[in-house]
Amino acid sequence: MSLLLPIGTAALSLSPAERTSADEQLLEWHHEAAGYKVRHVPATLPDVLKTKRMLDWEYASVRERRLPEAFSAMQDQLQWLSSGVSDYEIAVPVHEIESCAAGTAYYKGVEKSVRYEQLGFIADQCDQMFPRLRIFLFDAHRVFSSPVTIFGPNLAVVYVGQCYLAFREVERVKSLSSHFDWLVREAVVDARNVSTHIRSLIER
């Protein structure tokens, strides 16, 4: 369930970010944006591109494990992405990829085979779905972003941990779109080179 709150001329929708209701809500937003470009800054690696083994590791610490439902939701999102209904741009801090490759920070304790399979899958999807899927890597020492998704010109959603803040006021959506454009301009690895960069990290 979401709650609409008036903020000036805008409407702010608060939706719970708990699995798996959040996954269902995200899929609804993706379908709503059919035909429009979707832009996304994930909290970690992009959920839509996570492998089952990576999700299994992430869910290991969750009290009520709902991995089957979560993986099914991710598969639905990946199928939507593969359909080519919308172009999809993702901006990820380069240190996120490097940490996954090295098994440091958030990925400390993840088996090497799990981490490398995950990165290999992302690289493969980049090759197979380019240019409708474009991933850019930015340097978080130079630029920063909270997790956010812009669903075309009419909806932008910011992730704040326990809930999603969804903005539908045009100027707010434009502002977040401009923010994403800034991340792309400042990218240290362009979408054309991301798969090569990722493979270089796991082939060392």
Outline where the language-model segments fall.
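Basic, Lys/Arg-rich alpha-helical nucleic-acid-recognition elements, primarily the DNA-binding modules
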Residues: M1-P16
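Short coil/turn segments at secondary-structure boundaries
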Residues: S13-T20, N193
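Hydrophobic protein-protein interaction segments
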Residues: H30-E203
